[in-house]
Amino acid sequence: MFQPQKHTLVWPTKSDKGEPIAHVHYQPLTMGQHRTLSEQHKNNDTQLLRACISASTGLSETEIKSLVTPDYTSIQNQVLELMNATASQLIEGEFDSAAPTLLIPIQSDSGQQKTQYTLKPPTVATTDLMDTHANEWERTIFISSSCTGFSQSELERLSLSDWNQLQERLIDFLQQPAAYFHPKT
């Protein structure tokens, strides 16, 4: 299970309430959080990054602006690393790509906790159906749901690392020949 990471500030600051902040904890964003923030800050990468840092750390915009630049750079780098990592990069031990373990378990639509899922390659009929969707996002959600059995709302609850892992494998399914998937001996 993923444990939140911590950065000890070299230059402690104060919270909006005047309390000292000496440590900042990082939590992975969910795919849904990131999608919402991306839509809100479409044309401003700096604001998007700061919104992602705020969502990951719980720091307000004012608290982020009170950080000294070296501490901010450390936090920014760690948040970006979490946002871009795949679950297999963060999970210790062997990773099963056919039945991946979730870095951060989610609650299913039925209320059960999901700690892993079964990933199956799409059929040609499924990829034909995927191509009928109007835009890239709809195609991505359709193929992700078809290959995992997750609903759109369950997909939105996946951590970005779990989402990145899923997308990496789906790209393999859509682009690689069968020989790519044979076990290596």
PLM regions: where:
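Charged interaction scaffolds used for protein-protein
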Residues: 1-43, 55-57, 61-132, 153, ...
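Mixed-charge, glycine-accented linear interaction segment located at domain edges/termini
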Residues: 136-154
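A detector of tandemly repeated sequence units and domain arrays
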Residues: 51-52
